[in-house]
Amino acid sequence: MTKKRIETGTSEGDALGFSADLFSGWLELCDDCRLYLYCIISRHRNEGNARNLIRRWISDGYDVRIVKPSVIMQHILHKFSFEQFHEYLPDHYDDEVEVWRRRFTPYAPKYISCPAGRVDTA
């Protein structure tokens, strides 16, 4: 599986709506449409930008996963039916780490049509 680190202030970040005028942070985009958000700082607090960004990613078909979210972020994630899980992310952590994502259901999209082609993941 190929992963690409994407930061705000890059063309890849802008293509995902993760723009430097709204956020500071970084994520990893995998070629299987998993999107791991490791760090996000909103430049304009309480304006709904993080919520809108997550909504966009879900709508675009990404399997959005938030690593070690803050309490405020957890509140946002509950509204999108995210749940706490644990994953092993050996590139960044020695042990399993808290990752919030939506539980798969038979009715959930399988992310096969994600727009990963919009972003160079190689």
Regions found by a protein language model. Name each.
Residues 53, 72-76:
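Conserved short alpha-helix immediately C-terminal to the canonical SAM/SAH-binding motif I
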Residues 76-78, 82:
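Conserved active-site tyrosine of GNAT-family acetyltransferases
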